[in-house]
Amino acid sequence: MKIKIEYRKLGREQAHGIAESDGIVIIDSRLKGKKHLEILLHECLHILNPMDDENAIIDKSVTLCKILWKEGYRRVDNSNDTPLQDGSK
């Protein structure tokens, strides 16, 4: 499944992020750091698990965010050299 990430200010929508049914995730461009990671995970989980209720999505996104943040994940390196498990980059 392909998910496209877009960034724009979402003040009018009163949301940090939006997941659209066509696989587009919109993230508020003002988010930084750990909150950015949490919302990115949250909106992607909505697309990957459309039957989950909001509380399940929140639980999963917060758990994943805490694990990744503790492991040192930060949005710094944009290199694409090593393929993922499915062979894609």
Residues covered by each model-derived region:
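Metalloprotease/metallohydrolase-associated module, dominated by Zn2+-dependent proteases
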Residues: M1-K35, P50-K89
